[in-house]
């Protein structure tokens, strides 16, 4: 069976760590298989940050793609090709940097889309595993701080789970 550490803390006043609780369970004769960390969203959205769309123009070789310049808080703006119909300059968005792995083991790589190099991905809710909306990218409030990790901005939790017999 699995026991949520956060659920347990709702009922017990204790400063014990998940591993200390597992050790105490073992000490009283409960067979504990281990303690594992589980992200609220698979992968914890590592490599996904709040970014700002600085520029947005029609792609020269497509009637539905846009070429954007994105500030992800690391320095020079990045060129990103985006197919979302609602992307516009001035928006704060969730941006997956090169190397990020989205739910479904989708790894973000530098790519060339119809002749334009793209250095990341502006994401919709369903692509991040935080909702079902795929009508367009997730647009954040104007005060969203550029460079903040998506995990921190969205207040996603890491859950410790104790597995026992």
Feature map (PLM): residue ranges:
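Phosphate-backbone binding interfaces of nucleic-acid-interacting proteins
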Residues: 1-165
